[in-house]
Amino acid sequence: MFQRQKKKLFFTPQKAQKCIIGMRKIAGVHKTMLVNATQMLKDAKAGHYAVGHFNINNLEWIKAVLTTAQEMKAPVILGVSMGAAKYMGGYEVVANLVKGLDKSLGITVPVALHLDHGNFEAAKACIAAGFTSVMFDGSSLPFEENVEKTKELVALAHSKGISVEAEVGAIGGTEDGITADGEVADPEECKKIVALGIDFLAAGIGNIHGIYPEDWKGLHLDVLEKINEATGNIPLVLHGGSGIPNEQIVAAIKEGVSKINVNTECQLAFAAATIKYCAEGKADPTAANLEKGYDPRKLLKPGYEAIKATVKEKIQLFGTEGKAA
C-alpha cells in the first residue's frame, strides 16, 4: 500500500509566532505580548545597529517611548530602575501599566520591559511581577560572588523565558542616589560572566550615568574591542548613552554594542520643555486668555513631545528605524 513520505517541517516556534502576529496585524487584532530582549539584541548585533533602552519614569514617559517606537517601526526596550519603580508604585504597577498602554495604543513593534541596575532581590521581584527582562548589577560585589548570584538568577529567569543582563566593571556617575567612579572592565572577567549563560553584557569602558564632565576622556574603544573579541556573539550594552558624542556611539556599535541606555537626555528635555511652558505664563491661572493651561494634560504635553523628539533622534542614530517593519 502506498504511504505518503513524511516531510520534515521547518516551521519553528519563532516563525509560527511571527506568522500569528502578522495575521493579527492584517485582521486588525492586537495581542498584548511583551517579549524578552534576547532575539532583538541578537538581530541588532548581527545587523550592526543598537536597540534603544529608554528609562521610564511615569505614564508620559511610557507613552512617549511606545508611540515613537511604533511610528518609527523600531524595536524598543523600556527600562526602569528600582527607584523609578518605587516612585510609580511598585514593579507590578509598572508591568501592568506598560502592558495596558501597549494594548490600548495598539503597539505592534517588539517591546521588552527591563529592570535596570537591579540587585538580586529586585531582579527576582521583577521576574515574579511580569517583567520580560532583568539586569542583575553585581558589579560592586567581589567577582566570585557576582558569578554565583548571576548563575542563580540566570537559571530562574531562563526557566520563565526572561532575558538576563549582567555587568562587569561598575558604570560611573550617580544612579538612584548612589555615586560610583567609572571602571574599565577586564575582558577575561567578561568572558567568565558570559559563560554563565547570560543574554547580554554591560561592560564598563569609561562610560558614566548622568551628565558627562567637560574633562571626560571618552570611551575606551580599545578595551571594548578586546571585550567583543573575548565574548564572541554576545550582545554588549552601553550604559550612560546620554551625552556621548555621536561618532563614539557609532564606533561602539561597530565593536559589538547592541543596546544603548538613555535616561538623562530625556529627563533634561522634559524638564526644559516644562520650564519653558511655565516661564511663558501658560500655566498661570490669572493670565489673560488662559485656556486652563494648568491642566496637567496641557502642562505635561510639551515635556511629552520633547521626550518623543529625543527618542526619535536616538533611534535614528542607533540605526534601529524600520527594523521592526
Predicted stretch roles:
Residues 56, 113-119, 235-246:
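Glycine-rich beta-to-alpha transition loops that act as phosphate-gripper elements at the mouths
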Residues 10-29:
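Short, positively charged and aromatic/hydrophobic N-terminal segments
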Residues 84-86, 141-143, 266-271:
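Short gly/pro/ser/thr-enriched loop/turn and capping motifs at secondary-structure boundaries
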Residues 246-325:
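C-terminal alpha-helical cap/extension of soluble enzyme domains
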Residues 29-52:
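N-terminal amphipathic alpha-helix/helix-capping segment at the start of soluble metabolic enzymes
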Residues 205, 240-242, 264:
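Active-site proximal loops enriched in glycine and acidic residues that flank catalytic Cys/His/Asp
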Residues 37-43, 59-83, 93-108, 120-232, ...:
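Alpha/beta enzyme core
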